[in-house]
């Protein structure tokens, strides 16, 4: 792990700022797995590092804008090229998928308003949709927004997991209720037969397990 990557992942802002001040070009250089420093800060949930890196970047792409919640840049990029909302990055994510995963509500809502498909899976064979990503990360506001846009509430990805499975596993009662009110099926099992009630029980959410049983 290089110095830049280490400082981002540990959230050492003072040292990161000193390093970037000495060599601003580092903010543009990919780190491990060919990930940009900005995306790395998002994945490690280091918002202060994200803000710092943005000061050293003269431009970012739509995927970085969606992940970091840079609405002004996102809106400009979509305005200049509306088809970007359907594009995949090298890791197979759409801008909407990234906004949902990182809980960037305004970015996600704007992308949907501009034509992003709420049911478009990430690239590959996983079958993961934006609602899976939002539910897995406990972003209730994003899940509610997707439900309002007629997302497929019972959609499963490759292991059979539905959004309801995520809500049950995490004990998120508000999300659970929102999904159930939208028609979530409590009886859909995962590939191995595990139901949402099973996940709730296994994770100590007994009240939710009772609701789902």
Segment roles from a protein language model:
Residues 13-20, 46-54, 70-78, 104-112, ...:
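Ankyrin repeat structural motif
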Residues 1-32, 70-87:
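N-terminal segments that cap or nucleate solenoid repeat domains
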Residues 26-28, 85, 118, 153, ...:
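Ankyrin-repeat inter-repeat connecting loop/turn
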Residues 1-4, 29-37, 59-64, 88-95, ...:
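Ankyrin-repeat boundary/"N-cap" motif
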Residues 6-11, 40-46, 64-70, 98-104, ...:
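Ankyrin repeat A-helix N-terminal signature
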Residues 153-199:
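Ankyrin-repeat and related helical/solenoid repeat scaffolds used for protein-protein interactions
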Residues 119-148:
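Alpha-helical adaptor scaffolds
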Residues 1-6, 51-64, 80, 149, ...:
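Ankyrin-repeat-protein effector appendages
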